[in-house]
Amino acid sequence: MATKFPKFSQALAQDPATRRIWYGIATAHDLEAHDGMTEENLYQKIFASHFGHLAVIFLWTAGNLFHVAWQGNFEKWVSNPLKVKPIAHAIWDPHFGESAIKAFSKGNTYPVNIAFSGVYQWWYTIGFRTNQELYLGSVGLLILASVLLFAGWLHLQPKFRPSLAWFKNNESRLNHHLSGLLGVSSLAWTGHIVHVAIPASRGVHVGWENFLTTPPHPAGLTPFYSGDWTVYAANPDSANHVYGTAEGAGTAILTFLGGFHPQTQSLWLSDIAHHQLAIAVVFIVAGHMYRTNFGIGHNMKEILDAHRPPGGRLGAGHTGLFETITNSLHMQLGLALACLGVATSLTAQHMYAITPYAFLSKDFTTEAALYTHHQYIAGFLMVGAFAHGAIFFVRDYDPELNKNNVLARMLEHKEAIISHLSWASLFLGFHTLGLYIHNDTVVAFGQPEKQILFEPLFAEYIQAASGKAVYEFNTLLSSSTSPATVAGNQIWLPGWLEAINNNKNDLFLKIGPGDFLVHHAIALGLHTTTLILVKGALDARGSKLMPDKKDFGYSFPCDGPGRGGTCDISAWDAFYLAMFWMLNTIGWVTFYWHWKHMTIWGGNPGQFDESSNYIMGWLRDYLWLNSSPLINGYNPFGMNNLSVWAWMFLFGHLIWATGFMFLISWRGYWQELIETLVWAHERTPLANLVRWRDKPVALSIVQARLVGLVHFTVGYVLTYAAFVIASTAGKYG
C-alpha cells in the first residue's frame, strides 16, 4: 500500500477520515511532534530551513528587480521622479476590453500596474540609475539564492550537520551574530553608501569597472590614519544641491546635519552613512564581549545567576533562566518575534516621519501603503510572540529549574498582572467611548459647542521639548536660550530645528483634541490585546480550575459552558481572540494615520481636527467620503484605472464575510451537512462513480475557528489595502 500523507506521523497517515489531511497540514510545521524526532534533528532541520527562507527572500527581491527592469520605466522615472508614475509591471489579460486597456495604459505603454511599494525610490537612493544595473542586481541575487539553497541542502547531509552542542553554544552564537551579522553587514552597507550611493547622488557613477579607482573623498584615507576625522564631515552638500547632479554638491561623507535634503525631503545620505557606521562599531564591539575559546569576556550564565537584588525581593532572581532559554526554542522564538514586531512598527513610523529615501515623501500613496503594510506585519509578529510564549509554558517550562526565580514569581502573581491590565482596559474603554458618544450626541442635536474637547498638553510639551515652537511652551529645544538649543545649533544636528518647524514634512505633526481621543482609543486596543495575550500565556499551563494541563497541549479548545471553565485556560482561544483585537486596533491606527495625512496633503487639516472628535465624523468624513473612488471604479459611464481596486475592495469584503460562516456555527451542524452531501452524492447517477478514500468528517471546533479567522484576517487586510491605495491615488495620483 502506498504511504499516505503525512509521512511525519504514522498515526495520522492511518486515519481513515478526512481529518488526516487537515491535521496533517496543521502539524506539518510542528516539527517537535513528528515521529522519531530527536532534539538534535529538530535543531538541524530548523537551521537548514533558514537557508531556504533566505533563498526565498532573495528570489522574491530578484523578481522585483527583474520585472521593473523588463516592464517598468525606471530610467524614465529617474529622469523626473516627481512627475513620472513608477510602473510595477505590465498587465497581461485578454479579457480586458477596450475601455480597460485605455484606463490602464500610461502614455503609449501597454496596460500597466503602478508601483506603490517604494522600490523605485529605494533603488534610486542606493545608487541604481539604469535598467542594466537592475538586471545585474537581479542575476546577482538569483546566484545568491542558489548558493543558499545548496547550503541548506548541504547542512542536512550527515557530514555537515552541526551537533546539538554547537547550536547551544550561546556565547559563540551571540558573538558571531553581533559582530558578523549585524556589525560587519552594517559596515558593508556604510561602505556601499559612501562608495556608491553618495557619489551617485552627486552625479558620479561608480560601478564594478571603476569602484577601485574612484575614491569617495578627495582626501582619501589620509585623515583616517592621521586621526583628523572632521575632514570627512567638512563641506557637506549645500541647501540648493540638485539631487543626482554635481550642482551644489559637497564632498562630505560622514555628517551630523540633521533635518532633510531640501529637494528630496529625505534624510541626508551622509547622515545615514554616519549612523550606519556608528551601528557597525557598536555591534562589532558588542560581538567581542562574550567568553568563548580565549577565557576572556563575559559568561552569560554567570551574569544571569549574579542578577539577584540584595533586598531579596526577586527571590532567586535570574537563576535558571540561562538553561530555560537555551533549551526552549519557543522561548527564543517568542523573544525574537517580540523584538522584531517592535522594530517593524518603528519602521512604519520612521519610514514616513524621517524618510530615508529620495522623493518618497512626495509619493503619498506609497507612503500610506508602506505605513499600513509595516503596521499590520508588526501586529502579526507580536501576537505570534505571545502564542509561542504560551507554547513555552505548556511544553518547555520546568517548575523545578525555575523555582522562586523571576519567571516563577511572574506566574505566582499573575492575578495582579492580569487584573491591573483589566482595570487599565476598562478605564480607557469607558472613558474614551463616553467622550466620543457624548460628542456624537451633542453634535447630532445641533450643539457642537457642547463637545468635551481635551487639549493634549503632555504630548504638546514633549513636542515642544523636542523643538516644536508652535505651542509657545518655550522649553528645552523650543527655547532659543536653553543650553541644549545652543549646543545643538553648533555641534549636532543644526538642521533639526528647521525641519521640526517646517510644515512640509511629517516631523511632529500639530495635534489637538481629535488626536487626544484617538490616541486613547488606540491605547484601549493595545491594552486589551495585551491583556488577552498575557492572560493566555500566563494561564496556559494551568489556572485555579486545572492546576497543570501540560498534557492537554497548546490547542486545548475552549468547549463552551458545557465544560465549565475550559475557556478560561485555553491559550489557543486567547490567541484567537487577540487576533481580532489586534486587527481592529491596527485598523484604528491606520485610519488615524491615513485620515490625518489625507487632510494635511489636501491642505485642509481643519477637516480632521473638527470631524475626528466624534464617531459619526470618522464614519462620514473619513470612511464614507474616501470610499467614492472605490465606488466609482465602475459606473454607468465606463471604468477608470481604479477599477482594479474597486474589484479588490468588493472581493475583500466577500472573503471577510465568508469568515463568519465558520466563526458563527457549531461542529454538529457541519457534520450533519457533510453527511447529507455524502448521502446525496452516493445516490446520484454518474456522480457516484467518483469515490473517496477518506470518510468525510467536519472540521474540529479549533480548525473551523482557524479557517474563519484566516478568512476574516485576509478579507479585512485586502479590503483596507484597496481602500487606502484607491482613496489616496484617486486624490493625489
Curated annotation (Swiss-Prot):
Establish whether keyword Protease is in the entry: no
Binding site residues for chlorophyll a B3: M661, Y669
GO terms under cellular component: chloroplast thylakoid membrane; photosystem I
- Per UniProt, the enzyme's principal EC class comes to oxidoreductase
**One biological process term in Gene Ontology:** photosynthesis
Keyword terms, alphabetized:
4Fe-4S, Chlorophyll, Chloroplast, Chromophore, Electron transport, Iron, Iron-sulfur, Magnesium, Membrane, Metal-binding, Oxidoreductase, Photosynthesis, Photosystem I, Plastid, Thylakoid, Transmembrane, Transmembrane helix, Transport
Q: How is the cofactor bound?
A: P700 is a chlorophyll a/chlorophyll a' dimer, A0 is one or more chlorophyll a, A1 is one or both phylloquinones and FX is a shared 4Fe-4S iron-sulfur center.
Predominant cellular place of this UniProt entry's protein: plastid
Chain positions recorded as [4Fe-4S] cluster binding sites: C558, C567
List ligand-binding residues for phylloquinone: W670
Q: Which reaction does it catalyse?
A: reduced [plastocyanin] + hnu + oxidized [2Fe-2S]-[ferredoxin] = oxidized [plastocyanin] + reduced [2Fe-2S]-[ferredoxin]
The membrane topology noted for this protein in its Swiss-Prot or TrEMBL record is: Multi-pass membrane protein
The record's annotation in InterPro entries points to: PSI_PsaA/B, PSI_PsaA/B_CS, PSI_PsaA/B_sf, PSI_PsaB
Q: Which compartments is it annotated to reside in?
A: Plastid, Chloroplast thylakoid membrane
Q: Where does chlorophyll a B1 bind?
A: H653
* A GO MF label: chlorophyll binding
Q: Which Gene3D superfamilies match?
A: Photosystem I PsaA/PsaB
Would the keyword Transmembrane helix be found if you checked this record's keyword annotation? yes
TM spans (from-to)? 46-69, 134-157, 174-198, 272-290, 329-352, 368-394, 416-438, 516-534, 574-595, 642-664, 706-726
EC number(s) per UniProt?
Answer: 1.97.1.12
Q: Which domain of life is it from?
A: Eukaryota
Q: Which family does it belong to?
A: Belongs to the PsaA/PsaB family.
The record ties this protein, via HAMAP family, to: PSI_PsaB
Subunit details: The PsaA/B heterodimer binds the P700 chlorophyll special pair and subsequent electron acceptors. PSI consists of a core antenna complex that captures photons, and an electron transfer chain that converts photonic excitation into a charge separation. The eukaryotic PSI reaction center is composed of at least 11 subunits.
Primary role: PsaA and PsaB bind P700, the primary electron donor of photosystem I (PSI), as well as the electron acceptors A0, A1 and FX. PSI is a plastocyanin/cytochrome c6-ferredoxin oxidoreductase, converting photonic excitation into a charge separation, which transfers an electron from the donor P700 chlorophyll pair to the spectroscopically characterized acceptors A0, A1, FX, FA and FB in turn. Oxidized P700 is reduced on the lumenal side of the thylakoid membrane by plastocyanin or cytochrome c6.
What name goes with this protein? Answer: Photosystem I P700 chlorophyll a apoprotein A2
Species:
Phaeodactylum tricornutum (strain CCAP 1055/1)
